[in-house]
UniProtKB/Swiss-Prot annotation:
This is Alkaline phosphatase, tissue-nonspecific isozyme. Binds 1 Mg(2+) ion. Binds 2 Zn(2+) ions. Zn(2+) 1 binds at residues 60, 110, 378-379. The keyword Iron does not apply. Disulfide bonds join 139-201, 489-497. Residues 502-524 form a propeptide. Coiled coil: none annotated. The lineage of its organism: Eukaryota, Metazoa, Chordata, Craniata, Vertebrata. It is found in: Cell membrane; Extracellular vesicle membrane; Mitochondrion membrane; Mitochondrion intermembrane space. Phosphatase activity is specifically inhibited by 5-((5-chloro-2-methoxyphenyl)sulfonamido)nicotinamide (SBI-425). It comes from Mus musculus. In most mammals there are four different isozymes: placental (ALPP), germ cell (ALPG), intestinal (ALPI) and tissue non-specific (liver/bone/kidney) (ALPL/TNAP). Keywords: Biomineralization, Calcium, Cell membrane, Disulfide bond, Glycoprotein, GPI-anchor, Hydrolase, Lipoprotein, Magnesium, Membrane, Metal-binding, Mitochondrion, Phosphoprotein, Signal, Zinc.
Amino acid sequence: MISPFLVLAIGTCLTNSFVPEKERDPSYWRQQAQETLKNALKLQKLNTNVAKNVIMFLGDGMGVSTVTAARILKGQLHHNTGEETRLEMDKFPFVALSKTYNTNAQVPDSAGTATAYLCGVKANEGTVGVSAATERTRCNTTQGNEVTSILRWAKDAGKSVGIVTTTRVNHATPSAAYAHSADRDWYSDNEMPPEALSQGCKDIAYQLMHNIKDIDVIMGGGRKYMYPKNRTDVEYELDEKARGTRLDGLDLISIWKSFKPRHKHSHYVWNRTELLALDPSRVDYLLGLFEPGDMQYELNRNNLTDPSLSEMVEVALRILTKNLKGFFLLVEGGRIDHGHHEGKAKQALHEAVEMDQAIGKAGAMTSQKDTLTVVTADHSHVFTFGGYTPRGNSIFGLAPMVSDTDKKPFTAILYGNGPGYKVVDGERENVSMVDYAHNNYQAQSAVPLRHETHGGEDVAVFAKGPMAHLLHGVHEQNYIPHVMAYASCIGANLDHCAWAGSGSAPSPGALLLPLAVLSLRTLF
C-alpha cells in the first residue's frame, strides 16, 4: 500500500521538476500571446466562399473534459508533459458551444442529438430522423413526421456523400443521416416488436440500403444486421453472437450491390487488407463493414482485419473528392462514448486521440478555401479529472493527495457514476493495489451503475473554412446543419447562391443575408 505521505511527497517533487525551462521566462508567454493575437487579427477578413465540401466530425460523448484529457494524452504519447499540446481541433479558428438537450430530456441521448445536428430539428430521445411528434417505440407516430438530413440535401444537390464510423453503421449517429425510426435500437427486424413490423415500419439497416440508395461511401461495423438470421460471419465463424440477425431472410449486401449502376464500380470489403488494396480512382461506391457489431477499440484493433478511423477517412476522401460538385462526409468517433459508458477512460481517450488524427488527415487532404470542417460532440459524460495533479502527471495516474475520509489515494480520472464503484471489505477499493494503467481499468465512480451516464452540459463546436464564423457563440444544437447547408448552398439555402453555378464571385453581402428570410420548407 502506498503511504499517503509518499503520495504527497511525490506530488511536491513533480510540481517542482516538471516545469519546462522556457516557461520560467515571462517572455515565452508574452511572445506566445502576441503570436495568438496576430493570428486572431487575421480573422477579421472572413472566409465567405462557398463551401464546396463539408466534413463533420462527431466525437460521440466527447465533452470538454474529454477533449482536455485527450489533449494531454496526445502530448504524453509523444513524450511531452501534455498540457501544452495542441489537438488538431484546437487549431480551428472558430469555437462555439452547443446546447444538447432533447425535446423530452434534459440530459440527452445520441439519437435525438443526431437528429438535431444532422436534420436541423430537435427531437425526442431514442428517435432518429423524425420530429418530436414521434414518440419512442411507437411506430404509428412516425409517418408524416420524417425529417431529412444534410446528407440528403447534399446528395440532392449532386454532391457525393459518405458515412464513416467506428460504431455499427446503423447506430444512432449515422442512422439519423438516412433513416426515420421511432426507435434507435431497431437495428434489424430482429430487434423490432411485432406491432411495429405489422404497422409497416422498417428496421434501420433496411433503410440504409433503401432510403438513399446512392450513398457513395459507407464504412464502419454492423455486418450481422445485413444477413439472414444465423448466417455464419466471414471472420468469426464459431461465434454465434456474430451471426446474421435478419428475420426477413434478406441479404442486404447483395441488395446494395444490385442497386448500383452496371457502368459504375462498386466494392464491398470486410477487412483492412481489402480496403487498402483498393484504387480509389476506380471506386464509385464503397461499402466497408469490418465487424459484426461495433468496430474494435483502437487499443484492441487488429491491424490485419480492422482499419483505423484515419485510414477509413483517407480512403473516403480519395473517393469523394472526385466529384467536381463537392461532397458531404460524416465521420463519427463513436467508441469514445462506449469507453466512457464502460468506465474505461483509457479506451475512451485513445479513441478521441485517433479521431483527432483523422481530423488532421482530412485537413491535409482538403483546403480551407472550399471545405468547411466542423468538429463537435453529441453530448458529454460524467467524466472528470482533477485532484490538483502536478504538471506532466500521467493522465491515468494518481492525484497527489488522499481522501479525507478513508485516507486512500485516488486516480485523477473519476466518474460521477458507473461500473467503477468498487467496494472491498466494506470500504472503497485501494487503487494503489490494482493496475490503474491497464487498458480496461474502470475508473472509480461515486454512484454504482451498470453503465455510466451522459452529462448534460454544453459541448464545444470547432469550425474552420467557409462560413465557419457563423458558429460563434452559444447555440441550440439543431443550428449546426443550418450553418453547414447555408455555407454549401444546399437544402433550404439555395436562393442566395444562385450565382454559385455561374462561376461568378459571390459578394459577402449576398452570403450574409439573414437566415430568417430563407424558406425552411425543404428541410422537413
